[in-house]
Amino acid sequence: MATIRDVARRAGLSVATVSAVLNDKPGVSERSEQKVLQAIKELDYRPNRVARALSRNSSNTVGMLVPSVDNPFFPQVVKSVEDVFFENRYVTLIGNTEGKTDRALYYIRSMLSGWAEGLIITLTWEMTQPEVLDNLKRARVPVVGLAGARIISDFDAVVPDDPQGAFDAVYYLINLGHRNIGFIGVQDSQSTTLRLEGYRNALKAAGLTIQDELIMLGRSYEKADGYILTKALLRRRPRPTALFCYNDVMALGALSALHEENIRIPEEMSILGFDDTAGSYCYPQLTSVALPKTEMGFLAASLLLDRLKGKDTPPEVITVKPRLIIRDSTGPAAHHSELVAKGENASLI
């Protein structure tokens, strides 16, 4: 394997000049720089990353932790983050915690020992446990929270306006004539709590009764939980005519359950998701509350870059606005359609 001395010998220059080119230091002529770059290419020279980090006091490496790579929301956000850091010549290391504290600790320690200069974390349960927080704070590197709802006061964060997004979704269903609206979400989830807040506020704003028996929480936000919870809701009386789901993945499970029961969508039941990760790739296409995933990733990466460049201000929390995307999985409630057909005023609010 070629060394920096081999590059210097091939270029006919000093080791100091080669080092200056590698570290983007000023004072090297364009002719000398081209000689060094040509020698590097001919020798396939690859600088020792650790040595460079020590000499420059910088590794140009950041880390990002997500709770799941199966949930399509997170890969889309990761791509946005990675694009920003690539443009700024940083390497992005990705860790999948699976929502587990031990995995979070392993990745934090590994990334920091591997010279990560900063971290982006999701504001999910495992990242806010005492031992994890202690490791993050003792690391003395900038940390930015992204998505999730468990804001950590010491760190910058980019979060969605979950209550408003849920309010808009449920209010839309109410305007379609739905009175019995179910909700499926996740136990011990702060995001579920905030989306339930918006759900309840919309019902209150319309003067409708909150029916706790139509609210069901599962153990995870996976498709299987959406399927199981929807099956259970179908046995409730009154049976809901619309269902608001914690995310699109759970909504896919709900769609499967309804198809299995031969319940027509949206004629007999409307389905509405949240995050807009799968809305265009199912049948019928899913009405969903879209989160600006690319924007969220860009903002989080930009916040971290600012900290890496020395920005020293109090932690900043940026709240992004969701947007309701109307597709084919929602429609008027049956009684609402009958009133419209008769030419009567069907508005509830």
Residue map of PLM features:
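Short beta-strand segments enriched in small/hydrophobic residues
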Residues: 15-20, 54-70, 172, 180-186
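Short acidic capping loops at alpha-helix termini that bridge into adjacent secondary structure
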Residues: 179-180, 210-214, 264-271
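Hinge/beta->alpha junction and helix N-cap segments in small-molecule ligand-binding domains
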Residues: 67-76, 94-103, 148, 157-168, ...
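Flexible loop/turn connectors
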Residues: 229-349
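Short helix-capping segments at alpha-helix termini
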Residues: 87-88, 139, 204-210, 235-239, ...
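Alpha-helical recognition/docking segments in bacterial nutrient-uptake
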Residues: 60-171, 175, 235, 349
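N-terminal helix-turn-helix DNA-binding module of bacterial transcription factors
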Residues: 1-60, 348-349
